[in-house]
C-alpha cells in the first residue's frame, strides 16, 4: 500500500515537472518571439504604424481643451499630434480627470500621458519615464512695463508683492526679502499690481504667458525669470521600462525642436517659446 502511494507520488511529481518544464519552455519561446518581433506591444504598434493611446484632461487650457467648435486642442495636444506624425502613427486621445491620469497608465487604459506632467517626486520617478520635455516652467516676476527696478532677484528686497500666503511663490518672495500683500489668487494679484497697490507678483511663467497673450494691452511684462537650474520640464509620460519607446519619442521630439515645430506651437498658444530652457 505504501509502495503504491510512493509510486503514485513519484509519477505525479514527474508529470508536474514535465508540465512545469513545458510551461517554462512556452514562456521562454513567447519571450523570444516577442523580442524578435520588436519588443513591447507599444513598440510594435509604433514600428508598424499603428495607434497610440494618450491620456489627457481636455479641460486645462491652453494645454489641453476643446475649442469653440468642440475640437480637442491645446499645446500638449498639438505637440502630441506632431510627435505621432513624426512616428508615422495615429493617436487617440482618452480624456480623463487629472486625479485619475497616472492610474490610467497603471491600468493600461492608455500608453502615455500628455498633460503637463513633470515627474518631480522620487515615487513617480521610480515608477514612470518621461520623454524629452516639450515645455519648461519656473517662477517669473511680473510688474508694470515702465517699472525698471528689476535687475536681479536680490533686488526684490523691500518691494511689495501680491501673493497667496500659502503659495510656493509667496515663500520664494519672502526668501528674497519682499513684503507680502496677501491675495486670493493670480487674478487679484495682477489687479493690485495694475492699481499700484503692489509692486509685482510672482507666478509660474506658463500661467503668466497665458495671461499676457490674452491681455496684450495690460501694460505688464515679465521682469525676471528663474534660472534654468530651477525650471522643471514637462513631457510625455509612460510606465517605466520601455526604453526603446522612450528613445523613439525623444528622437521625434528632438526633430520637432530642430525643425521649429515646438517653437511655432509655443508661440501659437503662449506668444513665446516655452519649449527651451532660458
List each language-model region with its residue ranges.
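Acidic, polar ligand-binding/catalytic clefts
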Residues: 81, 90-155
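Bacterial lipoprotein signal-peptidase II cleavage site
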Residues: 19-29
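Short helix-initiation/N-cap motifs at beta->coil->alpha
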Residues: 77, 93-103, 148, 166-167, ...
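Periplasmic-binding protein-like
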Residues: 135-140, 205, 209-250, 272-278
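Extracytoplasmic small-molecule ligand-binding "clamshell" domains
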Residues: 29-116
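Extended ligand-binding regions for polar small-molecule ligands
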Residues: 20-22, 77-86, 167, 231-272
Amino acid at each position: 500500500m505504501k509502495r503504491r502511494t510512493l509510486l503514485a507520488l513519484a509519477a505525479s511529481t514527474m508529470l508536474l515537472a514535465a508540465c512545469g518544464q513545458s510551461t517554462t519552455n512556452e514562456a521562454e519561446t513567447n519571450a523570444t518571439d516577442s523580442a524578435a518581433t520588436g519588443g513591447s506591444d507599444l513598440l510594435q504598434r509604433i514600428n508598424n504604424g499603428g495607434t497610440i493611446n494618450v491620456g489627457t484632461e481636455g479641460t486645462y487650457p491652453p494645454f489641453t481643451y476643446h475649442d469653440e467648435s468642440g475640437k480637442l486642442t491645446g499645446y500638449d495636444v498639438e505637440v502630441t499630434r506632431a510627435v505621432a506624425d513624426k512616428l508615422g502613427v495615429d493617436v487617440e486621445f482618452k480624456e480623463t480627470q487629472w486625479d485619475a491620469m497616472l492610474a490610467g497608465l497603471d491600468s493600461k487604459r492608455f500608453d502615455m500621458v500628455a498633460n503637463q506632467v513633470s515627474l518631480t517626486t522620487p515615487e513617480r520617478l521610480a515608477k514612470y519615464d518621461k520623454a524629452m520635455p516639450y515645455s519648461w516652467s519656473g517662477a517669473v516676476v511680473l510688474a508694470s512695463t515702465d517699472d525698471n527696478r528689476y535687475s536681479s532677484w536680490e533686488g526684490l528686497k523691500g518691494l511689495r508683492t501680491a501673493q497667496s500666503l500659502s503659495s510656493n511663490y509667496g515663500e520664494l518672495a519672502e526668501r528674497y526679502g519682499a513684503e507680502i500683500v496677501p491675495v486670493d489668487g493670480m487674478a487679484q494679484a495682477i489687479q493690485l499690481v495694475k492699481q499700484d497697490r503692489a509692486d509685482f507678483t510672482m507666478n509660474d511663467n506658463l500661467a503668466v504667458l497665458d495671461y499676457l497673450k490674452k491681455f496684450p494691452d495690460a501694460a505688464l511684462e515679465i521682469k525676471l525669470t528663474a534660472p534654468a537650474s530651477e525650471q522643471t520640464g514637462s513631457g510625455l509620460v509612460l510606465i517605466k521600462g520601455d526604453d526603446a519607446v522612450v528613445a523613439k519619442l525623444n528622437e521625434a521630439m528632438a526633430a520637432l525642436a530642430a525643425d521649429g515645430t515646438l517653437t511655432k506651437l509655443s508661440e501659437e498658444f503662449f506668444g513665446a517659446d516655452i519649449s527651451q530652457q532660458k
